[in-house]
């Protein structure tokens, strides 16, 4: 009599299934962008003229703006244009960026980061950077609020003037001017 043993392990099952896991560039760009949010001394990733203009017009900050990647089957290369904080040591910022990008991409995708190129396109104080983040949308909202307050005040003035005019007319109506 022959005995048959069936070995059922997850490794055997996965090795029998063929397929391929790939990542779109924007997925890796998003991982990199989110990973960079808490790097000390990194104020922002510069998305270029049009991305920056978009951010000035409307409050839409995409974590992918300014992050460019090249994704292969096993490796990733990353290019960044950054704004560094004034009086911070830029090589330390660069080392932090490389470390966190490599760690997060590897942890989430098993891809190896083989290159991280960083170009410092500007240096600003935190105050300068925050002041420049005020968008046109914010300015329009502030103007609308100010206009609304001014209009409300003017409406109250007009109501008071009309009420005074009505009272005067009623006083004049009570006594005829000519007898």
Curated annotation (Swiss-Prot):
Residues 147-179 are annotated as: Disordered. It comes from the Bacteria. Residues 165-179 have a biased composition (Basic and acidic residues). PANTHER family: ALKALINE SHOCK PROTEIN 23, HYPOTHETICAL CYTOSOLIC PROTEIN-RELATED. Belongs to the asp23 family. This is Stress response regulator gls24 homolog. It comes from Streptococcus pyogenes serotype M6 (strain ATCC BAA-946 / MGAS10394).
């Amino acid at each position: 009599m022959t005995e048959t043993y069936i070995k059922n392990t997850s490794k055997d099952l996965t090795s029998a299934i063929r397929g391929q896991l790939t990542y779109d560039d924007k997925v890796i760009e998003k991982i990199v962008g989110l990973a960079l949010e808490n790097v000390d001394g990194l104020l922002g990733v510069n998305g270029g003229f049009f991305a920056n203009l978009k951010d000035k017009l409307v409050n839409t900050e995409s974590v992918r703006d300014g992050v460019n990647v090249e994704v292969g089957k096993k490796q990733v290369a990353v290019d960044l244009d950054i704004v560094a904080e004034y009086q911070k040591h830029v090589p330390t910022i660069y080392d932090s960026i490389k470390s966190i990008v490599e760690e997060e991409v590897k942890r989430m995708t098993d891809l190896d980061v083989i290159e991280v190129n960083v170009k410092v396109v500007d240096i600003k104080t935190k105050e300068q950077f925050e002041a420049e983040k005020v968008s046109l949308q914010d300015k329009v909202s502030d103007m609308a609020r100010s206009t609304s307050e001014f209009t409300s005040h003017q409406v109250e003035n007009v109501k008071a003037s009309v009420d005074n005019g009505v009272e005067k007319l009623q006083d004049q109506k009570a006594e005829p001017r000519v007898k």
